[in-house]
């Protein structure tokens, strides 16, 4: 079973804290830690990093806007999703919240199901953004590796072209895919150039791996360059 997702709820009303905590934890998907004010919340954040913060706006000493501004000024919390709970539903209040950096507003009294839906949506978006960032970094790394391999061709201490140790018989389409992979293109870009589906490109790349005895795009390009199978 997956670990519950950690959330932080900041509200000076004990009844709100207890009811929201009980509702969100009922699904088993969340663990909700509590803070009665912004100062407690800030102290908590020095030792824990929740996936999302739910905060009241009208609190004593430090209000929700000031708390959020402090979060956004700290590099550790700039991308931390924040949902505001508020009895102040005026447009100006919402604008101030969004300008300060909140991700969603929910006016009191609210339906707990709506709060849960907002929380799940924000967490899903954050995960998608994180995945996209990781994928982008991975693609950039592959591109740099391929570029470095090409620069080694012909260098005294680099890659030297030799005949392939095995007989290879690529179809015209496989050769086209190999050439484009060697340019650093990914499956979606190759599919667009060849006017085919990404699924078909995946099949061709898989066949190229099998025929060349390689297991990754970088290995495939190294093999192809080393044996003069592509430029």
Swiss-Prot record:
Q: How does it assemble?
A: Interacts with histidine kinase Hik2; may accept phosphate from Hik2.
Please give the superkingdom of this protein's source: Bacteria
This protein is called what?
A: Response regulator Rre1
Sorted alphabetically, which Pfam families does this protein's record hold?
A: GerE, Response_reg
Q: Which Gene3D superfamilies match?
A: 3.40.50.2300, Winged helix-like DNA-binding domain superfamily/Winged helix DNA-binding domain
CDD domains, sorted:
LuxR_C_like, REC_Ycf29
Name a single GO biological process.
regulation of DNA-templated transcription
At which residues is the DNA-binding region annotated?
187-206
Where's the HTH luxR-type domain? 163-228
GO MF, one term, reads: transcription cis-regulatory region binding
Any idea which residues bear 4-aspartylphosphate here?
56
Task: Write down the PANTHER family for this protein, in alphabetical order.
Answer: REGULATOR OF RPOS, TRANSCRIPTIONAL REGULATORY PROTEIN TCTD
- Keyword terms of this UniProt record: DNA-binding, Phosphoprotein, Transcription, Transcription regulation, Two-component regulatory system
Q: Which residues form the Response regulatory domain?
A: 6-123
- Recorded phenotype for the gene knockout or disruption: Loss or reduction of expression of about 30 genes in response to hyperosmotic (0.5 M sorbitol) or salt (0.5 M NaCl) stress. Most of these genes encode known heat-shock proteins.
The record's function comment reads: Member of at least 2 two-component regulatory systems Hik2/Rre1 and Hik34/Rre1. Responds to hyperosmotic stress, regulates expression of at least 24 genes including dnaK2 and hspA with Hik34 and sigB (sll0306), sll0528, slr1119, slr0852 and ssr3188 with Hik2. Responds to salt stress, regulates expression of at least 24 genes including adhA, dnaK2 and hspA with Hik34. Binds the adhA promoter. Phosphorylated by Hik2 in vitro. Phosphorylated protein has 10-fold higher affinity for DNA than unphosphorylated protein.
InterPro entries associated with the record: CheY-like_superfamily (IPR011006), Sig_transdc_resp-reg_C-effctor (IPR016032), Sig_transdc_resp-reg_receiver (IPR001789), Tscrpt_reg_LuxR_C (IPR000792), WalR-like (IPR039420), WH-like_DNA-bd_sf (IPR036388)
Q: Which gene encodes it?
A: rre1
Q: Name one GO cellular component term.
A: cytosol
């Amino acid at each position: 079973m997956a670990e519950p997702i950690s959330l932080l709820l900041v509200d000076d009303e004990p009844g709100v804290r207890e009811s929201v905590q009980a509702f969100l934890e009922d699904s088993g998907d969340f663990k909700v830690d509590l803070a009665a004010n912004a100062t407690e919340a800030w102290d908590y954040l020095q030792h824990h990093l929740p996936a999302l913060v739910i905060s009241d706006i009208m609190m004593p000493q430090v209000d929700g806007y000031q708390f959020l501004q402090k979060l956004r000024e700290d590099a550790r919390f700039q991308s931390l999703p924040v949902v505001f709970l508020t009895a102040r539903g005026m447009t100006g209040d919402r604008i101030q919240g969004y300008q300060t950096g909140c991700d969603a507003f929910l006016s009191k009294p609210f339906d707990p199901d709506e709060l849960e839906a907002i929380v799940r949506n924000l967490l899903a978006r954050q995960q998608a953004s994180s995945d996209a960032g990781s994928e982008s970094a991975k693609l950039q790394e592959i591109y740099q590796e391929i570029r470095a391999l090409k620069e080694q061709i012909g260098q005294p201490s680099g890659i030297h072209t030799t005949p392939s140790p095995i007989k290879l018989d690529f179809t015209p389409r496989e050769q086209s895919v190999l050439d484009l992979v060697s340019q650093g293109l990914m499956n979606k870009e190759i599919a667009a150039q060849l006017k085919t589906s990404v699924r078909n490109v995946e099949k061709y790349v898989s066949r190229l791996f099998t025929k060349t005895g390689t297991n990754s795009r970088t290995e495939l390009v190294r093999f192809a360059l080393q044996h003069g199978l592509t430029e």
